[in-house]
Amino acid sequence: SNYVEKGIAKGPFSKSYPHPNENKRFAYTLVEPNTWLNAEILDKYACLKPHSGTHYLASFYSVENSQFIPADNWLISPALPGEAQTISFWANNFNSQGTKYTENFEVLYSTSGIALDDFKSTGKKFEATTGEWKEYTVNLPEGATYFAIHNNTADTYMFMLDDVTYTAGCGKVLGYNVYRDGKLLKRIEPNAEPRITDNAPSG
């Protein structure tokens, strides 16, 4: 995955329960709440439990020079096959004793590379408000080679993603290396005829 990072990431329990990547720059980080928080906290804040399994991805609020920074966190998929497909994922936001920390996010796609300017809107913009995991589905058009989930909440707190499902591509062939006895004989470009001529060693 690829991401854009801005600011120093904090966490919802930064004083008593700092998460493992506290005070580091990241857009999303892998969270395993059972190794970070005790059972009492997880029971009190059930929204912090994974949708399935033991892990999920999360982006936290960030600060720079003691100022909160609006979220601009991108999670970019591996290469896709370029065919029309429907992707799905589960998202959640942090709720605390009736306070809803709403998270805004959108899904974009690229037909070329992974520079942020390459991405176009799918027209799908969402809000996570309930503090419960919810599934989202988005249709990607023919030609889509990447998709991105962009958290762009102005007053972000904690945004969570789990169980992202999509059909992956097989990547782009960059060339072929031909070896004999561990030594490189020739590199063949991807569009060249896959053939080499070589003299066998004597004996």
Set out the residue ranges of the language-model regions:
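Surface-exposed, low-complexity/disordered Ser/Thr/Gly/Pro/Asn-rich loops and linkers
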Residues: 12-80
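Extended, low-complexity, turn-rich repeat/linker tracts enriched in Gly/Pro/Ser/Thr and Asp/Glu
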Residues: 68, 92-103, 155-157
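Extended extracellular/luminal ectodomain segments enriched in beta-structured repeat modules
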Residues: 70-72, 80-90, 143-146
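Short strand-edge motifs at loop-to-beta-strand transitions and within beta-strands
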Residues: 75, 134-138, 194-198
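Solvent-exposed strand-to-loop "edge" motifs in beta-rich extracellular domains
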Residues: 78-82, 90-96, 110, 152
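Recognizes extended acidic, P/S/T-rich segments that occur
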Residues: 122-130, 172-202
